[in-house]
A protein has these predicted regions:
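Membrane-embedded hydrophobic alpha-helical segments
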Residues: 1-21
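Long, hydrophobic alpha-helical segments that serve as membrane-spanning/inserting helices
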Residues: 16-233
Length: 233
């Protein structure tokens, strides 16, 4: 009977050990996948913080300068380029793997390191704060997009969008139709549009703050992963 008891007990411990090792392997795989996702995220945020947003603000300034200082007639292409680039939105999307891990409790609970779990939950709180604000901003951006056709006819606006699809960044002079005309040459209409762009400009500045917070959280999480799991490149 003793031998049977010992055999059963050893079998139980062996099975428990196998499950433990399997769970540890899964945990490390989850963290490694998340690490790769966050590394891509830091690159994306670096671009938004240091390249896109400064250039976006410069196009808002250009729109003001050109509408304030130039006659509308004869400067359609130059003004249109500045205005359209002031409505080019690069939208940040949070890391996919991070969101999927948090939405699946069975996956999240495979992470046994409490320090790491707490850090991921804090990271998720930062992402949620950004998401709520970005949803509000998206509504303003949509209203700006739809009002652009009050200044430029739909056909020309479509050509500009086609150029944006090719460029996938701010438009160049060559992307602006040579025959472009405004639907109105009343500067007051353009001033109203500029006021709406200014609202977006202020909100983009707020979004920059969220980007910096998330970027710093990315960096801190990556450091923590490397410290706790000794992950290889």
């Amino acid at each position: 009977c003793l031998m049977i008891f010992l055999a059963v007990t050893l079998g139980f411990f062996a099975e428990s050990l196998r499950e433990h090792l399997a769970d540890k392997k899964k945990e490390k795989q989850i963290i490694f996948a998340l690490k790769k996702d966050l590394e891509k995220d830091t690159v994306r945020l670096y671009h938004l913080i240091n390249m896109y947003i400064p250039e976006y603000h410069s196009w808002i300034d250009s729109s003001h300068n050109e509408i304030d200082s130039l006659p509308l007639k004869g400067n359609e292409r130059r003004i249109c380029k500045a205005l359209f680039n002031s409505t080019y939105w690069e939208i940040y999307t949070p890391p996919v793997i991070a969101e999927s891990i948090l939405k699946d409790p069975s996956t999240f609970n495979l992470i046994k390191n409490e320090q790491v779990k707490t850090a991921i939950l804090n990271y998720n709180a930062d992402i949620n704060d950004y998401t709520r604000y970005s949803e509000f901003l998206a509504g303003l951006q949509h209203s700006i997009d739809t009002s652009f056709v009050t200044l430029v006819n739909r056909q020309d606006a479509r050509k500009l969008l086609d150029g944006l699809t090719i460029q996938n960044y701010f438009l160049e002079d060559s992307d602006i139709p040579k025959s472009i005309q405004f639907k109105t040459y009343d500067k007051a209409a353009f001033k109203i549009y500029l006021n709406r762009l200014d609202q977006i400009d202020f909100k983009i500045h707020d979004i920059l703050g969220f980007y910096k917070i998330i970027s710093e959280a990315d960096i801190q999480l990556l450091k923590l992963f490397n410290d706790q799991y000794r992950l290889e490149k």
